[in-house]
Amino acid sequence: MKPQEGSSNPTRKRTDYYPWWLDNLADDVTGEGAAIQGTIQGAEAVRRVVLDARKVYENQQFQFTGNYGDNGFLEEYTCQIQGQPNRVVVTVHRNAAGKAQHLVVNHRPRSSVLLFARVMGEKYAGTPLAKYFITTGC
């Protein structure tokens, strides 16, 4: 399957997927999400957060990856964070050059949003990325 092709076949839940866009970020890419306060800017910061998030996810299984519209790409997956169930939808907007320009990551349910924000806040405590996550009490 090519990176941009879609897959929603329920018998093909993928655990070996690597996001093509992670190695194709625009220099000025932005990232947002329900667990993120504000907007993360720049390829280095966005890549770091995505790679670290992938380490936090347990049992990540992709239900769908594929294009939407002319410049969009979607991912839908389930995972666990510290044993808690989590569903995630990622939208990627490509720029004219085909690079990932803007990401939006939405976790659900709300308890998972807050848990993810706290876990990432603990990870980034004392770093410039801490301001995007919950660090109170860390």
PLM region descriptions:
Residues 1-138:
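C-terminal and inter-domain tail/linker signature
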